[in-house]
């Protein structure tokens, strides 16, 4: 593996770690209606599990409600069940093929729990970044040992790997800070 490929590979892995964090944070309820809350909901449909978005239309008519318009009348009860099983703290209110999900306001205590959870996700992502950095540094040592790169180049590339790690770590911090503000906004 050459040095350019190594840098791109590390950057790609760090980018994936950041995307995983984004996905985890989307699942945290902020007290505002967002169809992203339902990304993790799967529904038993036609003999297999399907994402909710493949059996219904999702919309947010206001800041406190999510509407789920089920396309097939026979699917309404399994959509309700899927939403309940997802354990999102939402109570479905069914009206024909339309399921309304009122978003309850968050208590201060629940907001604090969500902030702690967001910080935990951030810390897990930083651990992933450090593991990626460690793997990159081990690869650099191997390249130096195999005489593919010189000692000074190894040092220079190690600094670049560290800078890349620091950059992504600060991105994680800013994403978490932004999510914290979103959660704490009443």
Curated annotation (Swiss-Prot):
Keywords: Cytoplasm, Protein biosynthesis. SUPFAM superfamilies: Ribosome recycling factor, RRF. GO terms for cellular component: cytosol. Pfam families: RRF. The keyword Protein biosynthesis applies. Its main location: cytoplasm. InterPro entries: Ribosome_recyc_fac (IPR002661), Ribosome_recyc_fac_dom (IPR023584), RRF_sf (IPR036191). It is found in: Cytoplasm. One of its GO terms (molecular function) is ribosomal large subunit binding. The keyword Ubl conjugation does not apply. GO terms for biological process: cytoplasmic translational termination. Belongs to the RRF family. Responsible for the release of ribosomes from messenger RNA at the termination of protein biosynthesis. May increase the efficiency of translation by recycling ribosomes from one round of translation to another. This is Ribosome-recycling factor.
């Amino acid at each position: 593996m050459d040095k350019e490929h190594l840098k791109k590979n590390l950057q790609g892995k760090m980018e994936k770690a950041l995307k995983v964090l984004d996905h985890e944070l989307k699942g945290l309820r902020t007290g505002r209606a967002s169809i992203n809350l339902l990304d993790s909901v799967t529904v038993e449909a036609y003999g297999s599990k399907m994402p909710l978005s493949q059996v219904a239309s999702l919309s947010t008519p206001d800041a406190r409600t999510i509407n789920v318009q089920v396309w097939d009348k026979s699917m309404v009860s399994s959509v309700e069940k899927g939403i309940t099983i997802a354990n999102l703290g939402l109570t479905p209110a069914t009206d024909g093929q339309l399921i309304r999900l009122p978003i309850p306001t968050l208590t201060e205590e629940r907001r604090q729990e969500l902030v702690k959870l967001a910080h935990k996700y951030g810390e897990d992502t930083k651990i992933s970044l450090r593991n990626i950095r460690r793997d990159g540094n081990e690869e650099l040592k191997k390249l130096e040992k195999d005489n593919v790169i010189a000692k000074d180049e190894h040092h220079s590339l190690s600094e670049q790997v560290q800078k890349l790690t620091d950059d992504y770590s600060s991105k994680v911090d800013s994403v978490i800070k932004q999510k914290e503000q979103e959660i704490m906004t009443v």
